[in-house]
């Protein structure tokens, strides 16, 4: 008998306080609560981890060695558990070979479709290429009127230069009597002399036949002989037609037969049409030049000389650095003397011809170089190779990976010139369905692709339709699922590494629905992230469909609409960190509203809200940043004006062009202007005005604050520097002569050398996951005994790293340098995290807020432009309230804050809104409306305005 609930008893993972909870099976369940309250600890680190662990444990020891076995979570028991699948926010893959098409398997079905019903065309002549068996050829010939005289020809030479004496001699030996040479019938013993410098066509007359019913096997035998002579190609030439018979055929008409996929005119051949030739991950299909990546990398002049305002002598040529190298300096001086230019003037002032010589070389022109080595002088006259050819040679010959990585910094990415970015060989791209090759189809948006497949059935013949029916069904279903999760703007060729966390999660969600599994526990992490309110309804319908297939859908979510649609809600809290970890409320949305202790309930009931500001800021004296003519990605020659000294929101449906406009164009262009040596490449635009009003532009994104466990909030914000300085000044430290390095766990001296300051020892286990155990020398404290003896208020430096931000604030309340760093972490809602918590354990939203805290603690100039891409990711509405307070504080200090956001509680507090759209992908990239929240709500064309209206009431 099936159990009705997943029963969790005694869950104590991370901050969970011995939780007991019953989760209804085969229902849509939302786990909510403040950021850091313990939602993920319950959903992912307890329930999913145990479900996955039990499944892997059930496998043989041989199979287990290839799988990662989860550690047993800190829980007494879980019953009623199903096999678990986690669909989290982590980006799918950074591998450039992984695309939306390969992840969803749509591309696999496309390959099969093209292999089975695609028609190959010659890339030279555009003629269709057919492959036929001898039996099919015989059937076609038998359709000719009886009594027709035909020649069966073997084209042994097609448009090639030469005399072909050997070939003609071989034909004589085989007994052939007549040839057609350049259109003239000739006896083989009486051939005209062939000009070896001209192109010729030579066909062997294999057989002369009058078609009737008594040919027997003669026709098939002659065809086989002809095909063998001409490498699988033969011509049938109609010499004479019966006079009394009307026919579609004409005298002297030629019919081409090929047992291979071969163009009879150009000779272009296809050896096979199988799914593998359409795979850019297979040597049979990948473009040989780019090896299936679709891109080439070339040394770029703009990367070699990144700041043209400085001189060559001062290091304008970045790979050569400053001219401290005597050899380089003497080389450049010789060039300057020869071409009459100075290496001490700004690079921008050099003539274009001099720049061309520097980059590409002097060609065959020799230059006199003088090299001095002490008392010796060596004079060499030779051409100058050029910076780019020199770098290319070094890149080709050097074996050092480090040097190759360094050289890669001076290369830019371009579409492959051989395959035009389609990744495939010519053989694959010549196969078409409805006049499109597979690369063109993969480059269409999901929405356009769905329409194309609907109309495709009308364009296929009965045979093709019969073959393609099941393939089309699979493709159409997967496209529908992608449409339902709001990804209609993506293309199948989009690289997986360029997707946001929310996009990659929804792709995997669509794939899971396509798999049709039932009896599974799905655990999802905020699937609504990055999704416009318009598409949220479709996403919820998708989650419900997953439930209706007979699965339990467990979603960590903050979205109100999702909570109202859920069958059951579990609210974890009441606060974050040590203040959370308890089940505060359970039930549907209506029940949650009435729990007084539930912060979620207070917002659902309206007892607590984020208020709309009574007035909006107008900015500094009409000063603004203007970006004109932006055309990056799908942007359609966009002009925007951002008033300075305001809180501005960039809105629009997913894929409309918000990030292309703000991150890839505005941010990168402004950064390149303010910091010319920065290695960023802005999207194309015409003009950028108003940068004289700002001195800094900062992109506060969700990338990790550190890649190693040694990075933590204290080190990132700079608080740890002041803490170490404080410990050095303690009397006991001074008496022992300790320096700052003594209190670092990154260098020798004060750290525990047994674990090298990690506090943990990694033990490799056969058939089991690696185990991390506390270092038994320092007991996990990271430092050696002598360092831990230094204490302030009875606490060692290791004790302080284990404190939460809130505790550390109280502990250092009398030390302003430390307190000011910590209070900003608390202001952004991170009071619950430990100041020494490993950076690798922080979520993207937490990492973003740590960065925001660092910016808050800096001395403000009031001339900074901050850009944040979806800062509400992972935030409860109460956390959003705190975040808005911080962002508005930055604006009140004179700065400008620009947020790309879907959350309507954030959008309604903006001073100015730029709505991009109206749709995603090709149908986006325009400015729908700009203005105050009231202006946006009044715009009928704006999807954002339609939903924003009810938030302004």
UniProtKB/Swiss-Prot annotation:
GO terms for cellular component: cytoplasm; excinuclease repair complex. InterPro entries: ABC_transporter-like_ATP-bd, ABC_transporter-like_CS, P-loop_NTPase, UvrA, UvrA_DNA-bd, UvrA_inter. PROSITE patterns: ABC_TRANSPORTER_1, ABC_TRANSPORTER_2. One of its GO terms (biological process) is nucleotide-excision repair. A zinc finger (C4-type) spans 752-778. GO terms for molecular function: ATP binding; ATP hydrolysis activity; DNA binding; excinuclease ABC activity; zinc ion binding. Its main location: cytoplasm. It is found in: Cytoplasm. ATP binds at residues 33-40, 652-659. Residues 320-599, 619-949 form the ABC transporter domain. The keyword Nucleotide-binding applies. Keywords: ATP-binding, Cytoplasm, DNA damage, DNA excision, DNA repair, DNA-binding, Excision nuclease, Metal-binding, Nucleotide-binding, Repeat, SOS response, Zinc, Zinc-finger. NCBIfam families: PRK00349.1, uvra. Belongs to the ABC transporter superfamily. UvrA family. The UvrABC repair system catalyzes the recognition and processing of DNA lesions. UvrA is an ATPase and a DNA-binding protein. A damage recognition complex composed of 2 UvrA and 2 UvrB subunits scans DNA for abnormalities. When the presence of a lesion has been verified by UvrB, the UvrA molecules dissociate. Forms a heterotetramer with UvrB during the search for lesions. HAMAP family: UvrA. This is UvrABC system protein A. The gene is uvrA.
């Amino acid at each position: 008998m099936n159990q009705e609930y997943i029963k969790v008893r005694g869950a104590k993972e991370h901050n969970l306080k011995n939780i007991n909870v019953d989760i209804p099976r085969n229902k849509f369940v939302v786990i909510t609560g403040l950021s850091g309250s313990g939602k993920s600890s319950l959903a992912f680190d307890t329930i999913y981890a145990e479900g996955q662990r039990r499944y892997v444990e059930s496998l043989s020891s041989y199979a287990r060695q290839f799988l990662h076995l989860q550690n047993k979570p800190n829980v007494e028991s879980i019953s009623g558990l199903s096999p678990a699948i986690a669909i989290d926010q982590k980006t799918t893959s950074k591998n450039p070979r992984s695309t939306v098409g390969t992840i969803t398997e749509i591309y696999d079905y496309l390959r099969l479709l093209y292999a089975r019903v695609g028609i190959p065309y010659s890339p030279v002549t555009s003629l269709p290429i057919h492959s036929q068996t001898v039996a099919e050829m015989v059937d076609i010939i038998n359709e000719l009127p009886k009594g027709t005289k035909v020649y069966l020809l073997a084209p042994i030479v097609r448009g090639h230069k030469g005399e072909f004496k050997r070939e003609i001699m071989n034909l004589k030996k085989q007994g052939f009597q007549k040839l057609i040479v350049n259109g003239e019938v000739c006896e083989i013993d009486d051939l005209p002399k062939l000009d070896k410098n001209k192109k010729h066509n030579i066909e062997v007359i294999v057989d002369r036949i009058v078609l009737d019913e008594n040919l027997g096997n003669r026709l098939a035998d002659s065809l086989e002989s002809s095909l063998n002579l001409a490498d699988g190609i033969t011509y049938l030439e109609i010499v004479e037609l019966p006079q009394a018979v009307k026919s579609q055929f004409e005298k002297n008409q030629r019919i081409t037969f090929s047992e291979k996929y071969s163009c009879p005119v150009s000779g272009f051949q296809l050896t096979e049409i199988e799914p593998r030739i359409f795979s850019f991950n297979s040597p049979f299909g990948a473009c040989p030049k780019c090896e299936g990546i679709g891109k080439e990398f070339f040394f770029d002049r703009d990367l070699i000389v990144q700041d043209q305002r400085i001189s060559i002598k001062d290091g304008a040529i970045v790979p050569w650095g400053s001219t401290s190298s005597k050899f380089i300096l003497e080389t450049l001086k010789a060039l300057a003397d020869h071409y009459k230019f100075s290496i001490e003037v700004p690079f921008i002032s050099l003539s274009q011809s001099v720049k061309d010589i520097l980059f590409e070389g002097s060609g065959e022109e020799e230059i006199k170089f003088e090299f001095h080595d002490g008392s010796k002088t060596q004079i060499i006259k030779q051409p100058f190779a050029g910076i780019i050819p020199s770098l290319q040679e070094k890149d080709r010959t050097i074996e050092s990976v480090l040097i190759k990585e360094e050289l890669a910094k001076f290369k830019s990415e371009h579409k492959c010139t051989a395959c035009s970015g389609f990744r495939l060989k010519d053989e694959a791209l010549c196969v078409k369905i409805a006049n499109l090759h597979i690369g063109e189809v993969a480059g269409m948006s999901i929405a356009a692709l769905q329409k194309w497949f609907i109309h495709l059935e009308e364009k296929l013949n009965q045979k093709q339709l019969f073959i393609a029916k099941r393939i089309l069904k699979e493709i159409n279903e997967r496209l529908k699922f992608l449409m339902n999760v709001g990804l209609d703007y993506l293309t199948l060729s989009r690289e997986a590494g360029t997707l946001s966390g929310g996009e990659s999660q929804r792709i995997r969600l669509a794939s899971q629905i396509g798999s049709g599994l039932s009896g599974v526990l799905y655990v999802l992490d905020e699937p609504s992230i990055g999704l416009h309110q318009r598409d949220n309804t479709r996403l919820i319908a998708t989650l419900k469909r997953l439930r209706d297939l007979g699965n339990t859908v467990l979603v960590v979510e903050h979205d109100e609409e999702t909570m109202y649609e859920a069958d059951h809600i579990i609210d974890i809290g009441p606060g974050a960190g040590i203040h959370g970890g308890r089940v505060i409320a359970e039930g549907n949305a209506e029940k949650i509203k009435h729990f007084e202790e539930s912060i979620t309930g207070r917002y659902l009931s309206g007892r607590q809200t984020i208020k709309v500001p009574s007035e909006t800021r107008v900015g500094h004296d009409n000063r603004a940043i203007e970006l004109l003519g932006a055309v990056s990605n799908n942007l359609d020659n966009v002009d925007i004006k951002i008033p300075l000294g305001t809180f501005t929101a960039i809105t629009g449906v997913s894929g409309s062009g918000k990030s292309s406009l703000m991150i890839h164009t505005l941010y990168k262009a402004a950064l390149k202007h303010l910091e010319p040596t920065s290695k960023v490449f802005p999207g194309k635009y015409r003009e950028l005005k108003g940068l004289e009003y700002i001195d800094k532009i900062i992109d506060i994104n969700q990338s990790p604050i550190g890649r190693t466990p040694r990075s933590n909030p204290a080190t990132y914000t700079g608080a740890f520097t002041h803490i170490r300085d404080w410990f050095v000044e303690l009397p006991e430290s001074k008496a022992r002569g300790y320096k700052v390095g003594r209190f670092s766990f990154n260098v020798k001296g004060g750290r525990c050398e047994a674990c090298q300051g990690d506090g943990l020892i990694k033990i490799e286990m056969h058939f089991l996951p690696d185990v991390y155990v506390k270092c038994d020398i320092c007991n996990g404290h990271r430092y050696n005994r002598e360092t831990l003896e230094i204490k302030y208020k009875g606490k060692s430096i290791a004790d302080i790293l284990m404190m939460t931000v809130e505790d550390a604030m109280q502990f250092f309340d009398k030390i302003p340098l430390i307190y000011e760093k910590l209070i900003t972490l608390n202001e952004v809602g991170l009071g619950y995290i430990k100041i020494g918590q490993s950076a690798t354990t922080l979520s993207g939203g937490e990492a973003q807020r740590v960065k925001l805290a660092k910016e808050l603690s800096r001395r403000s100039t009031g001339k900074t432009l901050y850009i944040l891409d979806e800062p509400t990711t992972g935030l409860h509405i109460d956390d959003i309230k705190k975040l808005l307070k911080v962002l508005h504080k930055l604006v009140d200090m004179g700065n400008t804050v620009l947020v790309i956001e879907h959350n309507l509680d954030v959008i309604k507090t903006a001073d100015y809104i730029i709505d991009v759209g109206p749709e995603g992908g090709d149908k986006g990239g325009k400015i729908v409306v700009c203005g105050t929240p009231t202006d946006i709500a009044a715009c009928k064309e704006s999807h954002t305005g339609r939903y924003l209206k009810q938030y302004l009431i």
